[in-house]
């Protein structure tokens, strides 16, 4: 059972403030490749006044996370296409080289999954090892690339001290229920002078617009400044940049126990302004939904994922009002979400016999509009419920 925390999991302080409370937050798990099931939980998002980091104050417990990771995250293959994942890994390796990371020594990837990225590091000259609890993915890493994986969640005790020259943890830290302990583990296993590279969602750019930035399986929410603070508290120093909605921290283990951090006032002000904008945005969108209901227009959703769950959790939209669900990923077509009784369809279906209003719920907002252009040309309506998708089209730029 989830319990409310009374101390910050990042810095240990007790000066916590509630930002948002959601009575029923919806999220999906996938028992198999062909099933999707709703879960509904209360959610409280808060802010630490001591370190400026946002987090869930009622975080998921280990049982809930195990269910998510062993199913929705554990289904193999993933929804992402092989070419898409290969391009992500290629681009990230080029980023590391440009950042001055030596392609030599021993490397660890936490959350290594099927070993594709480690294979690239291996080809570049590193001796590699993975850490991931997913047995199917680890087996694929060994079969396809000869990459060995420690089947476990990373902790300070998973590997001996000073084992690695480089550690990568991409889109992992936001999932960790004890982030301070996790970063302490990185400090232990990375040799002095070695490097770590982390990726986490850039919640700062989303908060600035007043859009939801939370996911149930993400207990932690970082801005560029709060991520760098967390690294410096553990003796890492470097830079944080933003790339298409993702923060990238490349930091060196200085050997110091900790380093000074900057003032948290900017992040606290950002969080307070977010709360005001979020409440205003939800109120305005609920007014639009009320008008759609008055007109008797049937509503469909384009996009099935975190934007969809936040749409249902943050606004007055009820799942019973949805007449159709569309998604641009062919791997999802035909899947039926338990409780909705609606199969996921190709967005091309909209152009054939679209509903009254399509609610856009995906990061691919510009492409979605192009995909349903015939529907829009003949008078169909599309609404962007939350501003988040547009933000994630931004190019790379320095954030800290």
Language-model segments: what does each one mean?
Residues 2-162, 166, 170, 244-247, ...:
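Conserved N-terminal segment of class I S-adenosyl-L-methionine
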Residues 13, 125, 146-147, 193, ...:
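A generic structural signal for alpha->beta connector loops
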Residues 22-23, 29-31, 207-212, 337-338, ...:
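Short aromatic-enriched loop/helix-cap "lid" or pocket-rim segments at secondary-structure transitions
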Residues 120, 248-400:
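Hydrophobic, well-ordered beta-alpha structural blocks that scaffold small-molecule cofactor pockets
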């Amino acid at each position: 059972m989830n319990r409310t925390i009374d101390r910050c999991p990042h810095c240990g302080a007790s000066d916590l403030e509630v930002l948002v409370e959601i009575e029923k937050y919806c999220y999906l798990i996938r028992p198999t490749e062909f099933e999707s099931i709703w879960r509904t939980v209360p959610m409280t998002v808060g802010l630490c006044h001591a370190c400026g980091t946002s987090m869930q104050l009622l975080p998921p417990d280990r049982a809930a996370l195990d269910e998510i990771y062993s199913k929705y995250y554990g289904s193999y293959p993933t929804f992402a296409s092989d070419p898409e994942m290969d391009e992500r890994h290629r681009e990230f390796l080029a980023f590391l080289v440009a950042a001055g990371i030596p392609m030599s020594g021993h490397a660890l990837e936490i959350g290594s999954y099927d070993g594709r990225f480690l294979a690239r590091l291996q080809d570049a000259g590193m001796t590699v090892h993975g850490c991931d609890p997913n047995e199917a993915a680890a087996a694929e890493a060994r079969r396809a690339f000869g990459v060995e994986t420690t089947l476990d969640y990373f902790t300070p005790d998973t590997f001996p001290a000073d084992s690695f020259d480089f550690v990568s943890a991409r889109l992992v830290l936001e999932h960790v229920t004890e982030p301070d302990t996790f970063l302490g583990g990185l400090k232990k296993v990375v040799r002095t002078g070695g490097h770590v590279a982390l990726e986490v969602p850039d919640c700062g750019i989303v908060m600035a617009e007043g859009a939801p930035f939370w996911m149930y399986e993400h207990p932690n929410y970082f801005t560029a400044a709060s991520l760098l603070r967390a690294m410096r508290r553990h003796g890492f120093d470097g830079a944080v940049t933003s790339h298409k909605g993702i923060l990238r921290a490349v930091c060196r283990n200085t050997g110091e126990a900790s380093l000074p951090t900057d003032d948290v006032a900017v992040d606290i002000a950002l969080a307070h302004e977010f709360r005001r904008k979020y409440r205003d945005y939800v109120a305005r969108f609920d007014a639009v939904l009320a008008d759609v209901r008055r007109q008797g227009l049937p509503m469909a959703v384009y996009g099935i994922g975190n934007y969809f769950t936040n749409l249902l959790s943050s606004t007055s939209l009820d799942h019973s009002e949805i007449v159709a669900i569309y998604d641009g990923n062919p791997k999802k077509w035909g899947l039926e979400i338990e409780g909705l009784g609606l199969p996921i369809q190709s967005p091309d279906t909209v152009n054939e016999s679209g509903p009254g209003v399509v609610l856009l719920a995906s990061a691919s907002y510009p492409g979605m509009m192009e995909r349903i252009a015939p529907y829009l040309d003949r008078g169909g309506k599309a609404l962007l419920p939350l501003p988040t998708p547009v933000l994630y089209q931004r190019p790379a730029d320095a954030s800290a």
